[in-house]
Amino acid sequence: MPYTTLGEYQIHYIHKGNGETLIIFPDNIHAAQAYEQEIAYFSANYSVIAFDYPGFGGSSHEQHHPDEIQVDYFGFRADLVCHLLVTHHIESCHVLGVGGGALAALHFAGNQAFQHQLKVRSLIADSFLADFDKRTLHRWLDTREHFYVRNIQRLETWHGNDWRMLLDRDTCFLRGLADRGGYAVPDKILNSISCPVLLTGHLRDAALPGLAREYARLSDLIPDCTLYLSGKSGHSYLERPFAWSDPSAFRLVADLFLERVTAK
């Protein structure tokens, strides 16, 4: 498995394919391995990189500088990707962010990439809210517990024997955010995203109430924004992201979007 050293962290990543770079920001509790099907699909046309956040998957499980992470949780992950790209001499990329990974991807496209002189060519953000009030964030975390119950073996494969401790640590931090009022991606970051953006999701996602209203709000803030919302989940477990619950529809929409972007 390929690794790269970024400061005090060993970062595990998966790299497959050739062409323009497409980097995947996993959902909070996922590892790069969780996106094997997306990697296999998009690597037919792109050089796909999916990585494990520090504390998850095959990356270092030690938690260094917790104060920095707590101050800028999603921005920290966005900054990490900048260093990963710079280390590999990659100057531009397309981005796919899922769930909590979409929040880090928004930070990356609207702030950190510019700071590191990286060009973001496009961004696909799937199944997320960029504004969690206290109640909604607690509810999202409650729903996430159902994913644990049905996927114990998978989570252990992704993260190792200490998977429960890692996920509980993430949940504890996010519960703290919720208790302090929730979390919202700042408008100035959304306003600063200069690349084309595609927001995807399904309207039956029980973990993301008011998704259509939230995406409409984001489309007013992001300069070049396209929406696709499915009327069905395609899967009985509604907390799954649209990219997984209806992969054929997601890939069709993503392909059309990327074709438009690359044709410019």
Task: Give, region by region, the residue ranges found by the protein language model.
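Conserved alpha/beta-hydrolase "acid-adjacent" motif
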Residues: 206-214
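Active-site nucleophile elbow and catalytic-triad environment of alpha/beta-hydrolase enzymes
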Residues: 172-189
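Conserved HGGG/HGGXW glycine-rich cap/lid loop of the alpha/beta-hydrolase fold
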Residues: 9-63
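Short beta-strand/loop motif that positions the catalytic acidic residue
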Residues: 193, 199-201
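Alpha/beta-hydrolase fold catalytic core
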Residues: 1-25, 45-46, 91, 252-264
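Catalytic active-site module of serine/aspartate enzymes centered on a nucleophile-bearing elbow/loop
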Residues: 225-264
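Active-site loop/oxyanion-hole signature of alpha/beta-hydrolase fold enzymes
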Residues: 50-93
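Flexible "cap/lid" loop of the alpha/beta hydrolase fold
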Residues: 103-151
